[in-house]
Design a protein with these regions (language model features):
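PLP-dependent aminotransferase class I/II
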Residues: 69, 217-301
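N-terminal small-domain helix-loop-helix segment of the aminotransferase-like
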Residues: 2-93, 100
Length: 346
């Protein structure tokens, strides 16, 4: 078929992202029940009660199109973060913000630099727009910022940094981040993925929002999927200088964030009690897992997120054996950690 033949090679060679198996599929496949999903870094406490109530109260409005500007959520988040409303953009998960940035700022043949063992979607999206990825290995399970800076070439337009990193749960700290910024051209667009930033307890964690200036192109990505427990609604956001946001808005679909997601996110922002319960549960769960892994003499990477990377030997085999027992974890062979699995703190 000529239509297929005309598709660019960079599209035909894409390997689709494989999400973790849903509980229903595992139980159907193995004939089991009461499975536990520890694969996708979801909040085990679920959504905020206020978010659920907000959605229930407005279900009769589902015949109406959503607010394409996310006005009320934009105003609330602007106030909470202390940023101008015009510097915010919302997406169908923060994944969509990554895609919008790539479509806006990358041309075919342009390069993007990222860590080799970071969220695989970065490389997939870069390839999907005809860009090229330069992947730099982690050092001690975290971003090697000097090596990332050294990987920049004349074709580099964009760099991805995840802090904390997925799947390792590690962070880079303020001093090394500031040294890194001093090494990097301000013309390189930095996309800083902070999907798990709320879980960080290290006082030296650098909040990238504090480094936004008109001279430095930074997009900070955050999400309602993790701490706020709204993964099924798909809603995330980006913060960047208004000039960048204005360009990204031109390629955004007009109604990309559905109405229930906006209602729930707005209510979740106002539920400090649920946030505290979620963070407390994560802290206790992390301490428990680290203690048990130590008792079992299993090496693990100290985590600043809501998951932990643990070395189990044959990662894929352990994943399959746990799957048959109704425990779903995430194998990390695709991240070049064949001896590990990633376990959500549940």
């Amino acid at each position: 078929m000529k239509t297929v033949e005309q598709v660019p090679e960079y599209i035909r060679s894409l390997i689709p992202y494989e999400p973790g198996k849903p509980i229903e599929e595992v139980e159907r496949e193995y004939g089991i029940s009461n499975s536990v999903k520890l694969a996708s870094n979801e909040n085990p406490l679920g959504p905020s009660p206020k978010a659920l109530a907000a959605m229930r109260s407005k279900l009769e409005q589902l015949n109406l199109y959503p607010d394409g500007d996310c006005f009320y959520l934009r105003q609330a988040l602007s106030k909470k973060l202390g940023v101008a409303a015009e510097t915010l953009i919302f997406g169908n998960g923060s994944n969509e913000i990554i895609e919008l940035a790539a479509r806006t700022f990358l041309r075919p043949g342009d390069e993007a630099v990222m860590a080799e063992q970071a969220f695989v979607v970065y490389q997939l999206i870069v390839q999907a727009v005809g860009g090229r990825s330069r992947a730099v290995p982690l050092k001690n399970f975290t971003h090697d910022l000097p090596a990332l800076a050294a990987a920049v070439s004349t074709r580099t337009r964009m760099m991805f940094l995840a802090n904390p990193n997925n799947p390792t749960g590690t962070i880079f700290r303020r001093a090394e981040w500031e040294r890194f910024l001093g090494q990097l051209s301000p013309d390189i667009l930095l996309i800083v993925d902070e999907a798990y930033f709320e879980y960080v307890r290290d006082a030296d964690y650098p909040d990238s929002l504090r480094y936004h200036t008109h001279e430095r192109a930074i997009i900070t990505l955050r999400t309602f999927s993790k701490l706020y427990g709204l993964a099924g609604l798909r809603i995330g956001y980006g913060v960047a200088p208004q000039e960048l946001i204005s360009l990204m808005q031109r390629v955004r679909q007009p109604f990309n964030v559905n109405a229930p997601a906006q209602w729930a996110a707005l209510a979740a922002l106002d539920d400090a009690e649920h946030v505290k319960r979620s963070l407390d549960a994560n802290r206790r769960g992390l301490e428990f897992l680290q203690k048990e892994f130590t008792r079992l003499r299993l090496e693990f990477v100290p985590s600043q997120a809501n998951f932990i990377l643990v070395r189990v030997g044959r990662g894929q085999e352990v994943f399959q054996r746990l799957l048959k027992q109704g425990v779903i974890v995430r194998p990390t062979t695709g991240y070049r950690f064949p001896e590990h699995v990633r376990v959500t703190i549940g």
